[in-house]
Amino acid sequence: MSTAGDGERGTVGQEDSAAARPFRFSPEPTLEDIRRLHAEFAAERDWEQFHQPRNLLLALVGEVGELAELFQWKSDTEPGPQAWPPKERAALQEELSDVLIYLVALAARCHVDLPQAVISKMDTNRQRYPVHLSRGSACKYTDLPRGTISENQAVGAGDPASELRDQAST
């Protein structure tokens, strides 16, 4: 569980009052630990023969479907998953775990280093979605208004500090 000033770490049955604090994952297990645990689990059962990329992907999609069912038909006005009853929270934890396990297994089978791939993808996303064009917008990067305003104009609109910078640069 969390320590003072550590932020919330998620577990089933956590009280709703903790939802106001920032959420943080536990430092362990790492993705490599999860890959190893699943590989050992599959090897003990001689299941590697069934873990071709296609099969892992279909299993992943099935688990995403089970996760989606937990949210299906819930009203947008209902409290979020943080306030669900313990039985529903436990189901949420299990389905999210299944999704992660299959995602890690698929990445391992395809030799994709997920942590490095995430770093690379975030760099790509930063280029596709510059803050000054995408802040507060749900538009896809191909629909963003490229070249219509400068970064200083967008970020600094109404900001006294940016107005001082603009004046100093003229």
From Swiss-Prot:
<feature type="binding site">
    <location>
        <position position="98"/>
    </location>
    <ligand>
        <name>Mg(2+)</name>
    </ligand>
</feature>
<dbReference type="Pfam" id="PF12643">
    <property type="entry name" value="MazG-like"/>
</dbReference>
<feature type="binding site">
    <location>
        <begin position="47"/>
        <end position="51"/>
    </location>
    <ligand>
        <name>substrate</name>
    </ligand>
</feature>
<feature type="binding site">
    <location>
        <position position="38"/>
    </location>
    <ligand>
        <name>substrate</name>
    </ligand>
</feature>
<keyword id="KW-0460">Magnesium</keyword>
<dbReference type="GO" id="GO:0005829">
    <property type="term" value="C:cytosol"/>
</dbReference>
<keyword id="KW-0547">Nucleotide-binding</keyword>
<keyword id="KW-0378">Hydrolase</keyword>
<comment type="function">
    <text>Hydrolyzes deoxynucleoside triphosphates (dNTPs) to the corresponding nucleoside monophosphates. Has a strong preference for dCTP and its analogs including 5-iodo-dCTP and 5-methyl-dCTP for which it may even have a higher efficiency. May protect DNA or RNA against the incorporation of these genotoxic nucleotide analogs through their catabolism.</text>
</comment>
<dbReference type="GO" id="GO:0047840">
    <property type="term" value="F:dCTP diphosphatase activity"/>
</dbReference>
<dbReference type="GO" id="GO:0032556">
    <property type="term" value="F:pyrimidine deoxyribonucleotide binding"/>
</dbReference>
<feature type="binding site">
    <location>
        <position position="63"/>
    </location>
    <ligand>
        <name>Mg(2+)</name>
    </ligand>
</feature>
<keyword id="KW-0963">Cytoplasm</keyword>
<keyword id="KW-0007">Acetylation</keyword>
<feature type="binding site">
    <location>
        <position position="66"/>
    </location>
    <ligand>
        <name>Mg(2+)</name>
    </ligand>
</feature>
<feature type="binding site">
    <location>
        <position position="73"/>
    </location>
    <ligand>
        <name>substrate</name>
    </ligand>
</feature>
<dbReference type="GO" id="GO:0042802">
    <property type="term" value="F:identical protein binding"/>
</dbReference>
<feature type="region of interest" description="Disordered">
    <location>
        <begin position="150"/>
        <end position="170"/>
    </location>
</feature>
<protein>
    <recommendedName>
        <fullName>dCTP pyrophosphatase 1</fullName>
        <ecNumber>3.6.1.12</ecNumber>
    </recommendedName>
</protein>
<comment type="subunit">
    <text>Homotetramer.</text>
</comment>
<dbReference type="GO" id="GO:0047429">
    <property type="term" value="F:nucleoside triphosphate diphosphatase activity"/>
</dbReference>
<dbReference type="GO" id="GO:0042262">
    <property type="term" value="P:DNA protection"/>
</dbReference>
<dbReference type="GO" id="GO:0000287">
    <property type="term" value="F:magnesium ion binding"/>
</dbReference>
<feature type="binding site">
    <location>
        <position position="95"/>
    </location>
    <ligand>
        <name>Mg(2+)</name>
    </ligand>
</feature>
<dbReference type="GO" id="GO:0009143">
    <property type="term" value="P:nucleoside triphosphate catabolic process"/>
</dbReference>
<dbReference type="InterPro" id="IPR052555">
    <property type="entry name" value="dCTP_Pyrophosphatase"/>
</dbReference>
<keyword id="KW-0479">Metal-binding</keyword>
<keyword id="KW-0597">Phosphoprotein</keyword>
<feature type="modified residue" description="Phosphoserine">
    <location>
        <position position="2"/>
    </location>
</feature>
<dbReference type="GO" id="GO:0006253">
    <property type="term" value="P:dCTP catabolic process"/>
</dbReference>
<feature type="region of interest" description="Disordered">
    <location>
        <begin position="1"/>
        <end position="25"/>
    </location>
</feature>
<dbReference type="GO" id="GO:0016462">
    <property type="term" value="F:pyrophosphatase activity"/>
</dbReference>
<feature type="modified residue" description="N-acetylserine">
    <location>
        <position position="2"/>
    </location>
</feature>
<feature type="binding site">
    <location>
        <position position="102"/>
    </location>
    <ligand>
        <name>substrate</name>
    </ligand>
</feature>
<dbReference type="InterPro" id="IPR025984">
    <property type="entry name" value="DCTPP"/>
</dbReference>
